[in-house]
Amino acid sequence: MVRLPLKCLLWGCFLTAVHPEPPTSCKENQYPTNSRCCNLCPPGQKLVNHCTEVTETECLPCSSSEFLATWNREKHCHQHKYCDPNLGLQVQREGTSKTDTTCVCSEGHHCTNSACESCTLHSLCFPGLGVKQMATEVSDTICEPCPVGFFSNVSSASEKCQPWTSCESKGLVEQRAGTNKTDVVCGFQSRMRALVVIPITLGILFAVLLVFLCIRKVTKEQETKALHPKTERQDPVETIDLEDFPDSTAPVQETLHWCQPVTQEDGKESRISVQERE
């Protein structure tokens, strides 16, 4: 029973000798190794050899296409990011031994994700639609329909809806109304149209005036008849004075129209018409 604790003690001493415990803590920018604290390699350099009892940590600068941004004990530097133009990327800032290359989307493109590993073209607003919000490096174009009085006749990622042209302000007349895709068409007023409209207008005015005069005349005649009623016309009676004629008792020979004598019968009075006497 005494030998078991002794064996455990011996094994503990053996393991401690083979794997010595590192120091409990190292200074800032140091790392523990082989029971000692070694300095970390500064930004822009990579680790070549750990420190020993007689040497310091051995570091080597990164190549021109590599970088390390922090204090480290890395054996290899990181490659600079490649801004692939086929993905719509371009270099915003070249990388150094301490910093990585910064990529941004080229003109007319925006990032497809938060890491901006690739870019895509801005969406276009087609005719009838205008740009409500322009695209940025991380967001796409937002379009909106053109309201009444505005139009857009192009496909664009930057053009807003434009107002219709005011023909009146230019002294012109509207020949064709605008739509959400087309502008108003203005032009000069046609002379031929004026030559047609003017006579028609004058004719209408003349007709109205003529009707007015006729109505006025009829109304005036009716008023006159009402004030002065018309009296019934009587034919004059012709009177004949009998004194101008001889005594009707005297025998008179009657004649006909053809001057032929007519024999008066006894006992009948002679009747001569007023016309024959005249």
Swiss-Prot record:
Membrane topology: Single-pass type I membrane protein
TNFR-Cys repeats: 25-60, 61-103, 104-144, 145-187
Superkingdom assignment: Eukaryota
CDD domains reported in the protein's UniProt record: TNFRSF5 (cd13407)
Keyword ATP-binding: no
Extracellular side: 21-194
Biological process, per Gene Ontology: B cell activation; B cell mediated immunity; B cell proliferation; CD40 signaling pathway; cell surface receptor signaling pathway via JAK-STAT; cellular response to mechanical stimulus; defense response to protozoan; defense response to virus
InterPro entries in UniProt: TNFR/NGFR_Cys_rich_reg (IPR001368), TNFR_5 (IPR020435), TNFRSF5 (IPR052135), TNFRSF5_N (IPR034021)
Topological domain ranges for the Cytoplasmic compartment: 216-278
One cellular-component annotation, GO: intracellular membrane-bounded organelle
Primary residence: membrane
Pfam family, one: TNFR_c6
Transmembrane segments: 195-215
Glycosylation sites recorded in the entry for this protein: N153, N180
Disulphide bond pairs: C26-C37, C38-C51, C41-C59, C62-C77, C83-C103, C105-C119, C111-C116, C125-C143
One Gene Ontology MF term: ubiquitin protein ligase binding
SUPFAM superfamilies the UniProt entry points to: TNF receptor-like
UniProt subunit comment: Monomer and homodimer. Interacts with TRAF1, TRAF2, TRAF3, TRAF5 and TRAF6. Interacts with TRAF6 and MAP3K8; the interaction is required for ERK activation.
PANTHER family reported for this sequence: TUMOR NECROSIS FACTOR RECEPTOR SUPERFAMILY MEMBER 5
Functional description taken from the UniProt entry: Receptor for TNFSF5/CD40LG. Transduces TRAF6- and MAP3K8-mediated signals that activate ERK in macrophages and B cells, leading to induction of immunoglobulin secretion.
Stated name of the protein: Tumor necrosis factor receptor superfamily member 5
